[in-house]
Amino acid sequence: MHLEIIYWKLNKDGISLDDLNMHIDKENILQWKKIKEIESKIWIENKNEGWWGAIIVWKNKKPPLSELPKNIPRAIIKRPPDIRLEFSIVDKI
């Protein structure tokens, strides 16, 4: 399994966490649930520091971007994430 952590520091963009959170709706979640390679996706925020992003656990390899739902947050923020980290999962409980 693989873990991907993606997040943006938003205080310089004029975009609120609420602006992004309103796009985590039933339709968006259903689109992500259709991705068979995904184990779980967790949307995260830090209101004090203005961080917003997601943690994704992939069962195997991440599929090509063309097979994933549209990246709505990136379209709203209009820039790549500040942090994108990828890890191999050694073990879990």
Language model: regions and residue ranges:
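Short S/T/G/P-rich N-terminal loop/turn motif that feeds into the first structured element of a domain
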Residues: 1-52, 61-69, 81-93
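A common structural junction motif
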Residues: 72-80
